[in-house]
Design a protein with these regions (language model features):
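Membrane-interfacial terminal anchoring regions of lipid-handling membrane enzymes
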Residues: 1-467, 472-928
Length: 928
């Protein structure tokens, strides 16, 4: 039998309209504000202590987000705001405040000067024992005190408590006992929470809110949900006119400070104001909870049926039946099969299992997982439909990003994964956790496209966060791949069909210091067939767990709001029919989608993390034979760090804070480089056959230094060059570098950017400006001259690819090769060049780089593409571009490139035939 005193409420919440006069004991206190337990409540103290000890054993809460930051002013009153009254919640918050050295929650708050006397620092928005269950008595008293005393400062800290993080199941008979819900918790539910969910409990303190500011904004009618305050002014003015003279005088003083305040001396007089503030706080906490739990879940079978029988898919089924000559029933079964292929089957048990497994796995694989700028995501989560658009480096990306988001308290996103991952054992597990599967290619399959669009629309309208890799596949070179616009277009299509929340894209940079698939990537770039995913392949990867993989970095870039692009491109909202998926996007909207894709890639690059490994790779791969004297290596690393800090690529870019010596030691620890002892000074060189792998990490940050490298190369290769000439050449070739590396500098402001880069090089002593406006190299035997030569090297490989491509086009002539043939031939030539002259560096034969360059030539109108045949047509301007290469490349290298690109008709015909046969073997089997 439970003792009677254990059933007492934690505090007694009076609803009196006026404060009781302060007792002499309290007036005798020396401090105006004090936090003390009442001496006349020993049973409450005993109850709290005993309950706290029991709860501390049964419940192990996890703190989400950051702790609130409070001002040091002791005169500020601080209260924690919870939605529902609960003994367990109040004690849990008290334990958390004690553990994290926050102002205590279950300690009395007294302010004699302002007549505030509360026996706990917790405000319950819903209290079943209050006289008016719709109003919080404590909030009412605090509002009255703030209105009466202009100098009184009160901070409200909203707090979310989740007993379990399983999203609700629609139509579930056990939802009250299996997940956190939105109703007041009963005694039974509280006991169940403590006993079953105690180890899966989460607490998040939200940023403190100034009560006076909330009142001020409410009376002004600012912000979401403040329209309810429109009637407050007239009501409170009436109360003011009938109040006593001294109260009216106080009101006039308040109005002098804040004219929008209507002075009310009693708690009851502020009923509408308190009700509206309470509604505002409820809405805020509801949104925060939704951002952490996600939307209610529909049973997978029901969701598939809803998709198939939705008006949009019904129309698509009828169109498919008419086009294919099959029956509507057969077309419907086909659509249902497509839906079953892709629809996620979320299981919170699987998610929790993955969370525990991945927590162990990351400690085995990595020294740490470093996360940057996540606060941006948290600020948007409650009010926006989040679309995470990360770069794609590894299969680990799927799990890593979801893990970081879940660990920081937000709802886990649904991840669009290629159906190549839907393999036995692994496939169902991923489907139950984060993945919905889509085919790698479904061009021309109208019904599949319709089902996928409708599923995406369903997820977005249910406010489900989504994640997809805009590159379409994993980058094998470390550079960003050109964006694939399919999923992006579907997101825009859904927004224009009407959704509940505005869409915001979250560009996300993922950077590794070692990568599991590194060896496979190099082989695939060389032409080795791509290995299909399987359980055996997964087990092979598992064998690498004992290896050292360093740190992994996630950096969240500046969010991109879809509404901003719609305004820029004059795309009206709700411009597509809600019940159709086949309405095409018009030209303006398509142009907007393309622009969003490019901006996403640029923002991913802006958020890059310059890691120790990427810096080492950039330095050593630019040196002859990938080796440097250790002292010179340290100086070169320090130079690159200084350049990146003096003129940051972006405010979002993160630079390692390791010293150059620490960076070298770190690279040796990861077995990527090695130290060769020598009596004249130790040498640092790339270890074993790691050069090809290190090029991957160099390319992760190449965009940060590429313009500095380009300008250095122009000065270094010419000895002297006029500043105006340097700018002219750079402006001519910049569009190709921009296309390859997604540089964000605009063409019309490029001169200013170049001048800043040149000034940075001058300040570092790498180049010298002569009196006649000429830029010159430093003394040839100086340290700065050697550093300039190393810095000039990275851009050369890009320009060598450009020149080789242009040489091939010029030799074969206009109207003789298609775009695909040029890319294929350049890929083969790059492989040959890499083996003969470039230490087998994969940058020379990355097919995506040649595709990007040809695409840039077409976009800039240097090449014209025949719509029917795909044949490329060009004029002498191709030679003009190639002419600029001589300012950067040595004559010997230009001769080598021209020789490699010299192919006769027989060689070209043979190469094209072999490539065609290989592609037929690779793509001969297509899915229906």
């Amino acid at each position: 039998m439970i003792p009677k005193f254990l059933k007492k409420r934690i505090f007694k919440a009076p609803v009196a309209t006026d404060h009781t006069a302060s007792t002499p004991e309290f007036e005798a206190e020396m401090l105006p504000v004090a936090s003390t337990l009442y001496a006349n409540a020993p049973i409450n103290q005993l109850y709290r202590k005993l309950s706290g000890q029991l709860l501390d054993v049964a419940v192990k809460p996890k703190l989400l987000g950051e702790l609130p930051e409070f001002d040091d002013d002791d005169n500020i009153l601080r209260f924690y705001v919870l939605q529902d009254y609960s003994r367990s919640n109040s004690i849990l918050i008290d334990l958390q405040t004690q553990e994290h050295n926050l102002p205590p929650a279950l300690v009395g708050v007294q302010d004699i000067t302002h007549d505030v006397k509360e026996n706990a620092a917790i405000i319950f928005l819903h209290h079943p024992h209050a006289k008016d269950s719709q109003l919080s008595p404590r909030l009412s008293r605090l509002v009255a005190a703030v209105l009466q005393h202009p100098e009184l400062q009160v901070r409200l800290v909203p707090v979310s408590i989740l007993w379990g993080r399983a999203p609700e199941k629609e139509d579930s008979l056990f939802k009250l006992l299996t997940a956190d819900n939105w109703e007041d918790p009963s005694i039974t539910k509280q006991l169940f929470n403590i006993g079953v969910m105690g180890r899966d409990t989460f607490v998040q303190f939200h940023p403190p809110q100034d009560l006076r500011t909330l009142i001020h904004d409410s009376l002004k009618g600012d912000g979401e949900g403040f329209s309810v305050f429109d009637s407050v002014a007239s009501e409170t003015n009436t109360v003011q006119n009938t109040a006593q003279a001294d109260t009216a005088n106080d009101a006039n003083k308040v109005n002098d400070i804040a004219p929008s305040f209507a002075m009310v001396a009693s708690a009851d007089g502020n009923r509408e104001l308190v009700r509206s503030l309470q509604q505002q706080l409820n809405i805020y906490l509801d949104k925060q909870r939704a951002s952490m739990l996600g939307p209610d879940l529909s049973d997978r079978r029901n969701l598939v049926d809803k998709l198939v029988y939705s008006p949009a898919i019904k129309h698509a089924i009828e169109a498919e039946a008419a086009a294919s000559g099959t029956s509507v029933r057969e077309a419907r079964m086909l659509a249902k099969g497509y839906a079953n292929e892709m629809v996620n089957d979320y299981s919170h048990s699987i998610v929790r299992g993955f969370y525990k497994f991945l927590t162990w796995l990351w400690t085995q694989l990595y020294d740490g997982v470093e996360v940057h700028h996540f606060e941006r995501v948290r600020e948007l989560a409650a009010d926006y439909e989040l679309i995470y658009v990360p770069c794609h480096r590894s299969h680990v990306d799927y799990l890593l990003l979801s893990y970081v988001i879940y660990m920081r308290g937000l709802s886990i996103p649904y991840v669009a994964a290629g159906d190549n991952l839907d393999v036995p054992v692994l496939g169902p597990l991923l489907r139950g956790a984060v993945a919905f599967y889509i085919r790698r290619s479904f061009r021309g399959n109208a019904l599949y496209t319709a089902v996928l669009r409708e599923y995406m629309h369903t997820l977005i309208t249910r406010n489900t966060p989504i994640e997809y890799f805009i590159e379409g596949g994993r980058s094998r070179s470390g550079r960003l791949l050109p964006p694939k616009m399919g999923m992006l277009a579907m997101t825009v299509h859904s927004q224009l069909r009407r959704t509940n929340k505005p869409v915001v894209f979250i560009p996300t940079y993922i950077g590794y210091e070692r990568i599991m698939e590194g060896g496979t990537y190099v082989g695939e770039l060389k032409g080795k067939p791509k290995e299909s995913e399987s359980l055996i392949g997964l087990l092979k990867v598992g064998r690498k767990i004992e290896r050292i993989f360093g740190n992994v970095h996630l950096s969240f870039g500046t969010p991109l709001h879809l509404s901003d692009f719609m305004q820029k491109f004059d795309v009206p909202a709700n411009s597509l029919p809600a019940d159709r998926t086949d309405t095409p996007l018009d030209d303006k909207t398509s142009a907007m989608v393309d622009n969003i894709g490019v901006k996403v890639m640029q923002h991913i690059n802006k958020a890059a993390v310059i890691t120790p490994v990427s810096l080492l790779s950039l330095v050593l791969l630019s040196a002859p034979k990938a080796a440097l004297d250790e002292d010179i290596c340290r100086e070169q690393i320090a130079l690159y760090q200084g350049l990146a800090q003096h003129l940051p690529y972006s405010d979002d870019t993160i630079i390692t804070d390791m010293t150059p010596q620490q960076i070298i030691d770190y690279g040796i620890k990861l077995k990527l480089i090695e130290r060769i002892p020598h009596i004249l000074g130790d040498i640092i060189q790339v270890a074993g056959k790691q050069a090809a792998l290190l090029s991957y990490f160099r390319n992760n940050i190449l965009h940060v230094f590429i313009l500095l490298s380009f300008l250095s190369a122009l000065v270094a290769r010419n000895g002297r060059i006029e500043r105006s000439r340097l700018n002219s050449i750079a402006e001519q070739l910049y569009p190709f570098l921009q296309s390859e590396l997604f540089l964000y500098y605009s063409a019309h402001g490029l001169t200013e950017t170049l001048n800043k880069k040149v000034d940075s090089l001058l300040a570092s002593g790498l180049i010298v400006e002569l009196s006649d406006g000429m830029l010159s190299v430093p003394e040839t035997n100086s340290k700065c001259y050697q550093q300039l030569q190393v810095l000039a090297t990275p851009v050369e490989q890009s320009l060598e690819r450009y020149f080789m491509t242009l040489a091939l086009l010029a030799q074969q002539g206009s109207g003789n090769l298609t775009e695909n043939e040029v890319v294929d031939l350049c890929h083969l030539l790059g492989q040959r060049l890499s083996v003969l002259y470039a230490d087998d560096i994969p940058d020379f034969f990355d097919r995506a780089l040649f595709t990007s360059f040809i695409g840039a030539l077409i976009r800039l109108d240097y090449l014209q593409k025949d719509e029917e045949t795909g044949i490329l047509i060009f004029d002498q301007r191709i030679d003009d571009i190639a002419h600029h290469a001589k300012y950067v490349l040595s004559p010997d290298m230009m001769q080598i490139l021209q020789q490699v690109a010299s192919l006769n008709e027989e060689e070209i015909a043979h190469a094209i035939t072999e490539i065609s046969n290989k592609n037929q073997r690779k793509f001969g089997r297509k899915r229906s």
